[in-house]
Amino acid sequence: IEVANGRNFWEVIVERYNIKINLVEGSLEDIPKKGPVVIVSNHPFGILDGLLLGYILSKTRNDFKIIANRVFRKAKDLDDVVLPISFEENREGNLQNINTRNEAIRFLKGGGIVGIFPGGTVATSAKLFSRPLDPFWKRFTSKLILKSGATVVPIFFGGCYSRLFKKANHNSNNLRKF
């Protein structure tokens, strides 16, 4: 209702879930105000990372997109922001991802900013309750950066999720996609 009444979606989310952002190093001023930028970030918390990234980008520029699981486009407030990725390992999924990368490159060449989690899924641990790590970067990200000529700005989210979520995440490949 608040968003329908004109409030900023990202601010409503941060307030509603009482999210506190603590910048340890750097500044939002380090994100270029103009020109193509790719924000790369680790993915320790799942959905929360995308919401935080959206909030951060909304504070710096209006021309941003986030590459994320296509399911998030079902939320009408995110439809214009999300560049959808498919995790289906079939022809349809591959075509979706190629189209998304091409759309992201066009958006970047137009001077926009795109946020991405280069590992593609939420950090997970090799052994239950060991330190979770992001997966290796996908070629998707390197191609996006190289073909767009964008400036790359890293963002690091410190911390990790609860022991209960670690257990669920360790046992569910599907959960890592959100």
Where are these predicted regions, by residue range?
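Surface-exposed cleft-lining segments at the edges of enzyme active sites
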Residues: 86-96, 124-132
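Short amphipathic alpha-helices and their capping/turn segments at secondary-structure boundaries
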Residues: 100-110
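Catalytic core of membrane glycerolipid acyltransferases/transacylases, capturing the structured
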Residues: 38-94
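Membrane-anchoring hydrophobic helices of lipid-metabolizing enzymes
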Residues: 1-40, 50-52, 59-63, 79-80
